[in-house]
Amino acid sequence: MKSIILSCFVISAAASQSYLPTEQIDVQSSLLSDPNHVAGKTVDYMIAGGGLTGLTIAAKLTENPNINVLVIENGFYESSEGEIIEDLNDYGDIFGTTVDHAYEIVSQAINNRTENIRSGNGLGGSTLTNGGSWTRPHKAQIDSWEKVFGNKDWNWDNLFPYMQKAEIARPPNDVEIAAGHFYNSSCHGTNGTVHAGPRNNGEPYSPIIETLMDSAKERGVPTQLDFHCGVPRGISMIPNALHEDQVRSDAAREWLLPNYKRPNLQVLTGQFVGKVLINQTATSGAIPGYKAVGVNFGTNKNVNSNVYAKHEVLLASGSAVSPRILEYSGIGLKSVLDAAGIQQIVDLPVGLNMQDQTTTTVGSRTKPSGNGQGQAIYFATFNETFGDYAPPAHELLNTKLHQWATETVARGGFHNVTALEIQYENYRDWLVNEEVAYTELFLDTSGKINFDLWDLIPFTRGSVHIQGNDPYLRRFSYDPKFFMNELDLLGQAAGSKLAREISNTGGMQTYFDGETTPGSNLAYNADLDQWVDYVKQNFRANWHAVGTCSMMAEELGGVVDSAARVYGVEGLRVVDGSIPPTQVSSHVMTVFYAMSLKISDAILADFHAKSSKH
């Protein structure tokens, strides 16, 4: 196998702050699209996926000119149906285009419906398709990754500096502060890579946000806080991942464009990584060893090639795809692999522990006096969400954990009752003792009072598994098993009920001009049971799935260790959103960027340790 120094071309890194759409489209012509340029060759690190984590890690590794990296991405730099939607206010316009994977889930038992999971397909991944919300989780949640799940050094104090390192924060101006923003400079980074600041289209801000905060204060809810300091709670406006000119700050713009002029970085687009190439190494007793040596990639079973990795293969294809690559490679549950006709080499609970959230909408019209731009988040605690229904909800937490774990394992969402009960006990501790945010109510005031809301801490566990042995047919079962846990359904219903109440109480009555969703479809005095019935038929996925290649101790159900290395296979890591062992009370971009930087340091430490031995 021949080693190659990989190269490509880029416009000046100095111009990375402000690209015109035409300049962005020209980037694609500078990337590789012919697989023959890399087929049969060897690089130091092969990254499967050019999304948020893949591009971040590629940029960090290639800061060392002696490290050669190849990124293989299924998508391209821009959509074949038009350039990326740069205005975050219009992000939904890209759904259904070639930049949206639109994974179809299996029919859900709760309502016999299927839907598409929105996920970015292109360089930048879901940073091309999301709404850009920029928040961070609760300290206790990240601390549990070490304390509960055995991931050494994965705690708030260690991850927080990486969150700051990723960020170029733009403080709010006086007008934005008056509208409801708050900024604590000690919680932000200013010398990072991803731009984050207030969304501001130049129009006046709606008075609704300030009024909502005033009403919340009367109920003892904290307001106008910085949700980046480790305790997201209450109501405030938030920054978004965007430049000062309001252009999207996506992973391709910030991590690829300034760097792919490097002679040691190459990006191949329009190709799908099907499986990892794994060799058996020396046997230790009765247990054989295995090492990842490359990947097979292509477009179909008749048109595919191998490329080899001298050091490591890094899977960065996301929570829906990375577990499938592992399974096609012989890593996973025997029952799944046998059914697919694949020889198992390593037994790990790949594809289990999927944790996605569910979304409902409560929307109303505003009187003209309430018009204006603005978005805010209410991070509501468990008690705030349930209100008068909190006592029976607590009773469920105190009496049902073992039953829920048993039922979840029986449904195929996890594989070990005892280990899952530990997860559930951790979630109960968050909700009861730490008072982490349980529900996010996302308010948009652009001529309306619109709450999109979701249960942040689902107890339901789903799965994703391959169906067949040909990765290029992309046949798989994606099953979040929404609302198979009773508390999740009750929580989504209670959050929806809360959104209706706060839309039209106190000072909000000044601007409220009639509800549109649910509107007449649900009686205004509906009780929680009626809201449950409504939610069953009117929710959607939140598209934030994590956990399908969980990072935790192997005996707890881990697929990767605290350095993101796959158990039982040398030279193979999973480095994307499939590895967080828990959900968090946050939008996940900030966590994924910090993860990427921390894992990059681990990879580089191993590289330097190996180099020093030679």
UniProtKB/Swiss-Prot annotation:
Pfam families: GMC_oxred_C, GMC_oxred_N. Residues 1-15 form the signal peptide. Glycans are attached at residues 112, 184, 191, 279, 383, 416. The gene is gox1. It comes from Penicillium expansum (Blue mold rot fungus). Its cofactor is FAD. This is Glucose oxidase 1. Gene3D superfamilies: FAD/NAD(P)-binding domain, Glucose Oxidase, domain 2, Glucose Oxidase, domain 3. O2 binds at residues 565-566. PANTHER family: GLUCOSE-METHANOL-CHOLINE GMC OXIDOREDUCTASE (PTHR11552), GLUCOSE-METHANOL-CHOLINE OXIDOREDUCTASE N-TERMINAL DOMAIN-CONTAINING PROTEIN (PTHR11552:SF201). Glucose oxidase catalyzes the oxidation of beta-D-glucose to D-glucono-delta-lactone and hydrogen peroxide in the presence of molecular oxygen.
